[in-house]
Amino acid sequence: MTRLTRTGVAAIALVAATMCSIAGAPHVAAAACDGTYTIVVGGFGDGASTIFSGGVDQRVGYSAQLSSASVREGVNELNRLVRDQRQACPSQHAKVIGYSEGAAVAHIWVSENWATFDDVNAVLISDPKRQGGPGTDGLAGQFYAAVMGAPLYGADRNFGDIPTVSICTDDVICDSAAPSGWIGYLTGAHGNYSFDVDDYSDDGDGQWFNGVFMPW
């Protein structure tokens, strides 16, 4: 085989390989849109949302400070990320999970976006914006939290038609009159939850309060 012929064969092989890569690209993109897109928001001091384990697809990054400005930052970043993913994968279900201050971020996002976003569910773990009944409002719903201002201040259930699960277990953050009180908080009650995202379904709706499930 002459040098010219060898060069021609190599060029043809390179073109063929390139065409195969191009042809295979849509399949790879489709695979990335399979299943559920799980996005998580960590609590106070966990700006990288590292507390969660399991099949996490995206961790929201924000300042995670105890202020409404920080919560608004988290809501805006969550909104950007989840909408970017929806644009890339229009038919993919999204699951938003937040813990503590991150639960407030997820709570507010649902309240502000339920009318314009579907095929999504939310899991709120120790949500300070949890509205009482059973139990009492979370810390954000107490009168002294008014100094925080919007959007952190207040407690509600404005979830529209988005399936939302709230989980609160003897924890003053989500039930300000929890029996364990602040001593319980200091001894670990606030962390007595599962942070494996695979433990939470894609369609749960209602609340787990002190280990008992109740519908909204």
List each model region and its residues:
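Residue-identity detector for threonine
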Residues: T2-T7, T18, T36-T38, T50, ...
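Hydrophobic alpha-helical membrane segments, chiefly transmembrane helices and signal peptide h-regions
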Residues: A13-I22, Y99, Y193-D196, Y200-G204
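Serine-dependent carboxylesterase/thioesterase catalytic core
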Residues: N76-S166
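Secretory targeting and sorting signals
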Residues: M1-A30
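Active-site catalytic motif of lipid deacylating hydrolases and related acyltransferases
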Residues: A29-H93, R130, S166-W216
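Amphipathic, positively biased hydrophobic alpha-helical segments used for protein targeting
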Residues: G24, S53-G54, W109, N113
